């Protein structure tokens, strides 16, 4: 669900966050309006608002794990984890994590990719949120969920700064709630 | 979608429930310095680890004369994985530090205490593990966070800097306009080994007129002499470890 539909309607912080995100047309290929969050990271106030909104939502939900998807999930996840007293678990591309891992494959537009997590990072019945900068089809987040659930963890919610139109109206991803702050900027001419 | 379990090539110390203290802390002037014969992962020459006093002069640690009590916990929370990514390398795995909420909090606090109120407006972090430590520090000290990335990841106009690897070269990139001339920056990464990546990051920022106040890492591998590559820029680390 979008934050505006879930208690934050009219919250000026959401507008500041949205305004701070830069749209780069035709990256990585023609036709894609890339949502660039690096400009959000340059705006200290807006970046802080982003983290504060997630922290306010999750701090009293007994979340013991924040899992972040490489690499842009790493930009948001750790700050949230630190503020709510949770562990941070990086979910990485193949071959990056040095210890024993479990792996889940997921579909791309052409072909597939894999996501890995260290064995033992999460314990059964831990309550987890998964963070990424943006959700489009939900393929990556679904793979992340599978990794965590295979270890007996409970995925409480997936959270992203930006949610593409495909997910609007969908409050759930694979049966789990999805929480998104803003819609993409600059899509008007494409819809 | 299939869940696959993959074992690493070698892994002797897989304790995630309990961190294995594998790092040597070179911070006590009063103890006799350890003389340790170590094998360098690049050659078969054994190196004698230099004395703790010399180590303190070469790069500053978070411990001056008295060790900060938080350092030992941070050091012991880092897992060492032998022979990753290839034989001979003792990989310093900070993912176990991130699982220890107190150690991770203390790590950030140590950097924040050092850099707040120093007029630092930019925290630059090197992909990908610099992305884990940099943003919390930036948020706490009121600075921007600037990601420095491998080629073709950043969507906008970039400037690039090439640097040498053992075999070949690599490149890091930064968005044009992310920083302005005259800004004061720190550069963050989880670990400094040979110093190649950090040196490239320094060059990239200096090309656009930024003053690098310091490079800051959780871990240093002193035998690899990465500090020498940083030129005039000082280095601050929390933990030193054998390569």
UniProtKB/Swiss-Prot annotation, chain A:
It is found in: Cytoplasm. It catalyses: AMP + diphosphate = 5-phospho-alpha-D-ribose 1-diphosphate + adenine. Disruption phenotype: No visible phenotype under normal growth conditions. Keywords: Cytoplasm, Glycosyltransferase, Purine salvage, Transferase. The keyword Glycosyltransferase applies. GO terms for molecular function: adenine phosphoribosyltransferase activity. Pathway: Purine metabolism; AMP biosynthesis via salvage pathway; AMP from adenine: step 1/1. It holds the Pfam family Pribosyltran. Its EC number is 2.4.2.7. GO terms for biological process: adenine salvage; AMP salvage; purine ribonucleoside salvage. Its main location: cytoplasm. Homodimer. Catalyzes a salvage reaction resulting in the formation of AMP, that is energically less costly than de novo synthesis. May contribute to the recycling of adenine into adenylate nucleotides and the inactivation of cytokinins by phosphoribosylation. Possesses low activity toward adenine, but can efficiently convert cytokinins from free bases (active form) to the corresponding nucleotides (inactive form). Belongs to the purine/pyrimidine phosphoribosyltransferase family. HAMAP family: Aden_phosphoribosyltr (MF_00004). This is Adenine phosphoribosyltransferase 5. It comes from Arabidopsis thaliana (Mouse-ear cress). The gene is APT5.
Curated annotation (Swiss-Prot), chain B:
Its EC number is 2.4.2.7. It comes from the Eukaryota. Residues 1-52 form a transit peptide. It is an enzyme of class 2 (transferase). GO terms for molecular function: adenine phosphoribosyltransferase activity. Changing residue 85 to T: In apt1-5; loss of activity. It catalyses: AMP + diphosphate = 5-phospho-alpha-D-ribose 1-diphosphate + adenine. SUPFAM superfamilies: PRTase-like. Pathway: Purine metabolism; AMP biosynthesis via salvage pathway; AMP from adenine: step 1/1. Homodimer. NCBIfam families: apt, PRK02304.1-3, PRK02304.1-5. Plants with reduced activity of APT1 and increased levels of cellular adenine show enhanced stress tolerance and improve growth, leading to increases in plant biomass. PANTHER family: ADENINE PHOSPHORIBOSYLTRANSFERASE, ADENINE PHOSPHORIBOSYLTRANSFERASE 1, CHLOROPLASTIC. Belongs to the purine/pyrimidine phosphoribosyltransferase family. This is Adenine phosphoribosyltransferase 1, chloroplastic.
């Amino acid at each position: 669900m979008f934050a505006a539909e879930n208690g934050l309607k009219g919250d000026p912080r959401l507008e500041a966050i949205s305004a701070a995100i830069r749209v780069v047309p035709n990256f990585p290929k023609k036709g894609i309006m890339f949502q660039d969050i690096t400009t959000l990271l340059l705006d200290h106030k807006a970046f802080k608002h982003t983290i504060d909104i997630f922290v306010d939502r999750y701090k009293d939900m007994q979340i013991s794990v924040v899992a972040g998807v490489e690499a842009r999930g790493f930009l948001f996840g750790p700050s949230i984890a630190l503020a709510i007293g949770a562990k941070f678990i990086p979910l990485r591309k193949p071959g990056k994590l040095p210890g024993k891992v479990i792996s889940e494959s997921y579909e791309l537009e052409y072909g597939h990719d894999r996501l890995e997590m260290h064995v033992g990072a999460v314990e059964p019945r831990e309550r987890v949120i998964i963070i990424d900068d943006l959700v489009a089809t939900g393929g990556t987040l679904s793979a992340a969920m599978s990794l965590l659930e295979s270890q007996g963890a409970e995925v409480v919610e997936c959270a992203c700064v930006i949610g593409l139109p495909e997910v609007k109206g969908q409050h759930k991803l694979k049966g789990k709630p999805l929480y998104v702050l803003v819609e993409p900027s600059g899509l008007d001419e494409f819809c | 979608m299939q869940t696959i379990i993959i074992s690493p090539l070698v892994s002797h110390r897989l304790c995630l429930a309990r961190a294995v203290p594998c790092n040597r802390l070179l911070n006590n002037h009063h103890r006799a310095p350890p003389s340790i014969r170590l094998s360098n992962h690049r050659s078969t020459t054994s190196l004698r680890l230099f004395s703790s006093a010399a180590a303190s002069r070469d790069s500053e640690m978070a411990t001056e004369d008295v060790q900060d009590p938080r350092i030992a916990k941070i050091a012991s929370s880092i897992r060492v994985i032998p022979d990753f990514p290839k034989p001979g390398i003792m990989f310093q795995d900070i993912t176990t530090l991130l699982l220890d909420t107190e150690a991770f909090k203390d790590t950030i606090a140590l950097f924040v205490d050092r850099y707040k109120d120093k007029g630092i407006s930019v925290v630059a972090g090197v992909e990908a593990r610099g992305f884990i430590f940099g943003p919390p520090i930036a948020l706490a000290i009121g600075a921007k966070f600037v990601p420095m990335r491998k080629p073709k990841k950043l969507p906008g106009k970039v400037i690039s800097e090439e640097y040498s690897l053992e075999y070949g070269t690599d490149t890091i990139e930064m968005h044009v306009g992310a920083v302005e001339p005259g800004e004061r920056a720190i550069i963050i990464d989880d670990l400094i080994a040979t110093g190649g990546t950090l040196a490239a990051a320094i060059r990239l920022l200096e090309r656009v007129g930024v003053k690098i106040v310091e490079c800051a890492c959780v871990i240093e591998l002193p035998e690899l002499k990465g500090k020498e590559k940083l030129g005039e820029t000082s280095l601050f680390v929390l933990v030193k470890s054998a390569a």
